[in-house]
Design a protein with these regions (language model features):
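ATP/NTP phosphate-donor binding region
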Residues: 1-99
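A short, small-residue-rich loop immediately preceding and capping a beta-strand
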Residues: 93-115
Length: 115
């Protein structure tokens, strides 16, 4: 894995780059963002390809992991899907300290970031 430091006016952050690094990076993310609840937002396609992957990676991190699966596709980047995510967050008692992880591509990243 390689790391790239990005320095911008007023902020800086690190980007980790590599192949098959999620198992190494996810525990670090949880460790650097103290929480007892991780909410994963993904889509039906990713869920079929990687069932329980994040659960397995984080099983020894001592956090509760909840998974919100939404339909795949650009058509689902809308307020109805966002409302379903909000309902899910309320049902699993997510709070300000809960960590949300977008596990997927553009639509997942966009809608999770907005939520």
């Amino acid at each position: 894995m390689e790391s790239l430091n990005v320095n911008l006016p007023g902020r800086e952050y690190k980007i980790d780059i590599g192949f098959d690094i999620l198992g190494e990076c996810l525990p670090q993310v949880v460790q650097n963002n103290p929480t007892d609840h991780v909410v994963v937002v993904t889509n039906t396609t990713i869920e079929k390809l990687y069932p329980n992957y994040i659960f397995d990676v984080l099983q020894n991190s001592g956090v509760l992991v909840s998974s919100c699966v939404i339909p795949d596709g650009e058509d689902y980047k809308n307020l109805e899907t966002l409302s379903k995510i909000f309902d899910f967050l309320m049902n699993v008692c997510a709070n300000r300290e809960s960590l949300m992880i977008a596990f997927g591509g553009g639509v997942i990243g966009d809608i999770t970031g907005f939520a």
